[in-house]
Design a protein with these regions (language model features):
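Surface-exposed receptor/substrate recognition regions of extracellular proteins
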Residues: 1-55, 64, 585
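Intrinsic-disorder/low-complexity loop/linker signature
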Residues: 40, 252, 553, 617-619
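Consensus positions within tandem repeat domains that build extended binding/scaffold surfaces
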Residues: 66-69, 88-91, 111-116, 134-139, ...
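Short, aromatic/basic amphipathic alpha-helical patches
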Residues: 575, 597-607
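Structural signature of tandem-repeat unit edges
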Residues: 51-64, 73-86, 96-109, 119-132, ...
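Generic detector of short, aliphatic-rich beta-strand segments that form the cores of beta-sheets
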Residues: 36-46, 610-617, 624-626
């Protein structure tokens, strides 16, 4: 049944009907007037034909415009009479032809999203009788240049004026106590505002993404600023708080306010919240009030001009990445109250020169001073027990450091690429030294390994080109891959009897190493273990070794003699004796028949120039030593 047919039927309805509700629509043509001398209420179901309405009048008998009454219609103007007391949710949603609205005195309520996405609305007057505006009521009304709220309004709901592109100013009624989430979010041209004196709450991202606002003053009545209230306000330069305000500043309050240069934090706050000032690239200085006891993760991350910060004297905790990327920060004084420093706290602070970690701190978290390229001096507390991963990685100007006497663990890559580090003394308390700990410390000349350490992890001293000697204690039972690889000045090194395997490349390219003794506890020798050790003249492999891997003595230019034990069961890889121009003696402590039974890779001796293997019962000839053995 069409709307026109329904209207005929509705003439018979009793005279006490007064409401338009739920999607009045249909295909009634371009002109439609809702009035009748006997009709006071029209009830319809939601329809899809509202896009056909272009002109619409509401008679003085109507008291309510219901939810979803005219979504997607094409009205150019609307006059709401004084008889109407409320306008329902989404009543005129997405009416893109609507340019003006007149709402008469008497209307008390505008529902949520009532005019949402009326993208060409340019003029609307709100009556003083209005007491409530629902969330999103004028969201996406992009061309609305101004609006005056009646004095009775106490709350501006979430998204009420969001995404307006023409607002330049806004006056708040004095009775407003709450501004909801994203209420003015993405109002890009909204200038400086005066917040009302009775305001207590500003919701999440209420003014986020504003491109014009340069300063704002927070009233002393405000107790909560929601997450990201002023986030991405790219031109905001100054924020003023009441000195003694009791206020909850939540996550991301000023994140990406790239021109923010001045903010006074109130004495009532206790926490600097997560990403509060992240990417505030023009913030140069800030004082953290003494009421603050903690700073959450990423609070000042990438504040690239921050060079002066005064911390709370009651601060106990600094979270992860708080000062990550603060490239202008050259010094900072940590109060004695600090007990914890989070992961990456000072990472990429490339101008930080010196710092003292207060007593009471027991652990340095991962990446704490990662790539602090100007750091020359660090004082560590006696209370320190654990040092995490990558703490000083890339700190190229750090020349020396004292590790406190109670430290038991130093994590992976802790001092990697500390290119100026010349010496370090490790405490006897140390039990664990992480992999790549001193990798790339090209000026490190000496380092002790304490007696409680049981493992030298892979690449621990990789490319320590100035290291001349190392004493490995008997407690060590494992030496990992490339542990001393590239230590070109290493002349002396010992392998304790507790070691059973020599992993790949342990002493690879140790060109100054003249001799090495392998203990008889070793059963396995990995690939290129002594590769490129140009000053070794002989290598005696002890009884007990069962596996010799590829390239064990690869390119040892001065090598003349190798002794292979009777215990060997397999020789892995091709060209095991390749690159030894002076090698003349390969002695096997077994018979020719036993030698022949050893498992070998195809062409294991190719390009070596070797003619025979000297066995206990005579020489084993290599008939064609370029291709196959006898």
């Amino acid at each position: 049944m069409s709307i026109a047919e329904r209207l005929i039927e509705l003439k018979l309805i009793k005279h006490n009907l007064k409401t338009i509700i739920n999607g009045l629509g249909g295909r009634c043509g371009e002109n439609f007037t809702l009035y009748h001398t006997d009709l006071e209420k029209l009830i319809t179901e939601r329809d899809t034909g509202n896009e056909y309405f272009t002109n619409f009048n509401i008679s003085d008998n109507i008291t309510k415009i219901g939810d979803y009454a005219f979504p997607n219609a094409k009205f150019s103007s609307i006059n709401v009479p004084s008889s109407v007391k409320s306008i329902g949710e989404r009543a005129f949603f997405n009416n893109r032809s609507l340019t003006s609205v007149t709402i008469s005195e008497g209307v008390k309520q505008i529902g949520s999203d009532a005019f949402n996405s009326c993208s060409n609305l340019e003029q609307i007057n709100l009556p003083q009788s209005l007491e409530y505006i629902g969330w999103g009521a004028f969201n996406n009304c992009r061309k609305l240049p101004r609006i005056t709220l009646p004095t009775n309004i106490k709350e501006i709901g979430s998204y009420t004026f969001a995404n307006n592109r023409t607002f330049t100013n806004f006056e708040f009624p004095s009775m407003v106590t709450r501004i909801g989430d994203s209420a003015f979010s993405n109002c890009r041209k909204l200038g400086n505002i005066t917040l009302p004196d009775n305001l207590t709450y500003i919701g999440r991202e209420a003014f986020a993404y504003n491109q014009v606002m340069t300063e704002v003053t927070i009233p002393d009545t405000v107790t909560t600023l929601g997450n990201g209230v002023f986030a991405y306000c790219m031109n905001l330069e100054k924020v003023t708080f009441p000195e003694h305000a009791i206020i909850n500043l939540t996550d991301g309050t000023f994140k990406f306010c790239t021109k923010l240069r001045e903010v006074n934090l109130p004495n009532g706050i206790t926490t600097i919240s997560y990403i509060m000032f992240q990417n505030c690239a023009n913030l140069t200085s800030i004082t953290i009030p003494d009421t603050v006891i903690s700073m959450s993760s990423n609070a000042f991350m990438n504040c690239t001009k921050l060079n002066d910060i005064q911390l709370s004297q009651n601060l106990t905790s600094i979270g992860n990445s708080v000062f990550y990327g603060c490239t202008a920060l050259s010094s900072i004084t940590l109060p004695n109250s600090v007990q914890t420093l989070g992961d990456s706290t000072f990472r990429e602070c490339t101008n930080l020169q010196n710092i003292t970690i207060p007593e009471g701190v027991t652990k340095l978290e991962n990446n704490l001073f990662f790539n602090c390229k100007s750091l020359t001096e660090v004082t560590l507390p006696l209370t320190l027990v654990t040092m995490g991963l990558n703490i000083f990685l890339g700190d190229t100007l750090l020349t020396n450091i004292t590790i406190p006497k109670n430290v038991t663990t130093i994590g992976n890559s802790c001092f990697q690429e500390c290119g100026s580090l010349t010496s370090i003394t490790l405490p006897e308390s140390l039990k664990q030294l992480g992999s790549s700990c001193f990798n790339g410390c090209v000026k490190l000349q000496s380092c002790n390994i304490p007696s409680q350490v049981t493992r030298i992890e892979p690449a621990t001293f990789y490319r320590c080109k100035s290291l001349t000697s190392i004493t490995i204690p008997d407690s060590v039972n494992y030496i990992g891959n490339s542990a001393f690889d590239g230590c070109t000045k290493l002349q002396n090194a010992n392998i304790p009897n507790s070691v059973t395997r020599l992993e790949d490349r342990i002493f690879n390219n140790c060109v100054s190493l003249t001799n090495i003794t392998i203990p008889n506890t070793v059963t396995f020798i990995g690939q290129y273990t002594f590769g490129g050790c140009n000053n070794i003249t002989e290598l005696i492999i002890p009884e007990g070794v069962e596996t010799i891997s590829q390239g064990v003595v690869h390119a040892c230019q001065k090598l003349e003699k190798i002794v292979i034990p009777h215990s060997v069961k397999e020789i892995l890889g091709q060209g095991i004796f390749y690159g030894h121009p002076k090698l003349t003696d390969v002695i096997y402590n077994g018979t020719k028949e036993e030698w022949k039974k050893i498992k070998k890779a195809t062409n294991w001796w190719t390009q070596s120039g070797l003619a025979v293997i000297k066995c206990t019962d005579g020489d084993f000839p290599l008939r064609n030593y370029l291709t196959t053995e006898a």
